[in-house]
């Protein structure tokens, strides 16, 4: 599982030029799944994200998590996070989980985030979406469950 996390002042997602979800501040997550991801992977990543200390305290040190300060998450599915561009000029997406599996894991991931007390807004799984993000920092972090668990 890969999540591109972006701390933001605001974020929104539109489908066919209609805003379907938006947040006033917190985190925008672009979320992708691969074949080996499981519900346990989703649980691990949700807990990691909610607890990441990426907001500044009064000393301007990143020491506060979203769970500590409040805020919201805009979660957007993005199979292209598993693009393989090692051969040729066209990306291959064979490392991305099949749609049915990815959608089930995406729904579970969003539920786990919401269960932690965070407001979660989402895009539309599988849709062509326009995502607008006003980054704060900018703070952008790539989380890869395979890399994180191997350490």
UniProtKB/Swiss-Prot annotation:
Cited CDD domains: Dtyr_deacylase
Entry keyword annotation includes RNA-binding: yes
GO molecular function ontology, one term from the record: tRNA binding
Main location: cytoplasm
Keywords, comma-separated and alphabetical: Cytoplasm, Hydrolase, RNA-binding, tRNA-binding
Enzyme Commission identifier(s): 3.1.1.96
InterPro entries, per database record: Daa-tRNA_deacyls_DTD, DTD-like_sf
Keyword Hydrolase recorded: yes
Motif extent (Gly-cisPro motif, important for rejection of L-amino acids): 137-138
One GO biological process term: D-amino acid catabolic process
Compartments (UniProt record): Cytoplasm
Signal peptide: none
Gene Ontology CC, one term: cytoplasm
Recorded coiled-coil stretches: none
Annotated catalysed reactions: glycyl-tRNA(Ala) + H2O = tRNA(Ala) + glycine + H(+); a D-aminoacyl-tRNA + H2O = a tRNA + a D-alpha-amino acid + H(+)
Domain notes: A Gly-cisPro motif from one monomer fits into the active site of the other monomer to allow specific chiral rejection of L-amino acids.
Family under the similarity heading: Belongs to the DTD family.
Entry-linked PANTHER family: D-AMINOACYL-TRNA DEACYLASE 1, D-TYROSYL-TRNA TYR DEACYLASE
NCBIfam families: D-aminoacyl-tRNA deacylase (TIGR00256)
Oligomeric form and interacting partners: Homodimer.
Protein name: D-aminoacyl-tRNA deacylase
Organism: Listeria monocytogenes serotype 4a (strain HCC23)
């Amino acid at each position: 599982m890969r999540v591109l996390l972006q701390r933001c002042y605001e974020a929104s997602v539109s489908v066919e030029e209609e805003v379907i979800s938006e947040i006033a501040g917190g985190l925008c997550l672009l979320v992708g799944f691969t074949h080996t991801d499981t519900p346990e992977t989703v649980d691990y990543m949700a807990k990691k994200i909610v607890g990441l200390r990426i907001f500044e305290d009064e000393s301007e040190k990143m020491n506060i998590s979203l769970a500590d300060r409040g805020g919201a998450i805009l979660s957007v599915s993005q199979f292209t996070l598993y693009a393989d561009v090692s051969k040729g000029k066209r990306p291959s997406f064979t490392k991305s989980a099949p749609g049915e599996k990815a959608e089930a894991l995406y729904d579970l991931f969003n539920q786990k985030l919401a269960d932690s007390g965070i407001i979660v807004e989402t895009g539309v799984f599988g849709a062509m979406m326009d995502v607008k993000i006003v980054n704060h920092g900018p703070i952008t972090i790539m989380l890869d469950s395979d890399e994180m668990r191997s350490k």
